[in-house]
Regions:
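Extracytoplasmic metal-acquisition and chelation regions
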Residues: 20-254
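Sec-dependent N-terminal signal peptides of Gram-positive bacterial secreted proteins and lipoproteins
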Residues: 3-23
């Protein structure tokens, strides 16, 4: 009797299993290439459990100066997915890689986004970075069929991860607003236009970046503010600042 029951159960399993088999999604366990860390961070956050994510750039290089060889582009074009920023030189790489592999999947994270002063606004500004996250999420969803990878009760789906990112970036945006609103003096001096995105929070940002926008009037105003003690710091994005800032620092003991 026990043997009969076992045989019946085994037969049922054989009959049922083909109809319930789970097909692995073509986007599982893939290799994704991207460019800079802010984009890689989004990919790691949204899909890092299901893919190997690498940068096309060697570690430690200045991506502004580094140029990829045609041999490297040939290699990267064979990957499963390339995620790039079309507002940067990434776009040229994407075009070359697509020309080498017409089947290459791509996602443009900067779709519909613009910047005013510096490209770093795309990831330093929480609102812009959230748009980048949404573009990354939407791009992944275009290629993925498995509902579990999209959203699940375990909280590991792309939609679940996106909601976490959205919450954290919204908190950061709120912190910016609150901290600047509580500041007694709402003017800062910086050495790079990348900080000017803070103006959206009603903070006056005086940039001493050495470009066509820098005037003698601006430099003289900063000297006056430093001299009378109103400004005590110049915020820098780099270890080495430009000559204009060095001159003010050396002559006014800031």
């Amino acid at each position: 009797m026990k043997i009969k029951k076992f045989l019946i159960l085994a037969l049922l399993i054989i009959l049922i299993t083909p109809g319930c088999s789970i097909t692995k999604d073509s986007m599982e366990d893939i290799t994704i290439y991207t460019t800079i860390y802010p984009i890689k961070y989004l990919l790691d956050s949204l899909y890092g459990d299901n893919a190997t994510i690498n940068s096309i750039y060697p570690s430690g290089v200045d991506t502004n100066d580094y140029e990829l060889s045609d041999k490297k582009l040939e290699e990267y074009s064979k990957t499963d997915l390339f995620v790039f920023n079309s507002l940067d030189k990434d776009r040229d790489y994407a075009v070359k890689m697509i020309n080498k592999n017409k089947n290459l999947k791509v996602i443009d994270v900067s779709l519909g986004i613009t910047y005013v002063d510096d490209i770093t606004e795309l990831w330093l500004n929480p609102y812009n970075y959230l748009m980048m996250a949404q573009n990354t999420k939407d791009g992944l969803l275009e290629y993925i069929d498995n509902p579990y990878l999209i959203s699940n009760t375990d909280g590991t789906g792309i939609e679940n991860k996106y909601e976490e990112l959205k919450y954290n970036l919204s908190r950061l945006d709120a912190d910016y607003k609150e901290d600047i609103n509580l500041a007694t003096y709402k003017t800062i001096v910086v050495d790079d236009d990348m900080f000017k995105f803070l103006e959206k929070y009603n903070l006056r940002v005086i940039s001493l970046e050495d470009n066509d926008n820098l005037t003698d009037s601006t430099i003289n105003e900063v000297k006056k503010l430093v001299n009378n003690g109103t400004i005590k710091y110049i915020y820098s994005s780099k270890d080495e600042t430009n000559d204009v800032c060095k001159n003010i620092i050396n002559n006014y003991a800031i």
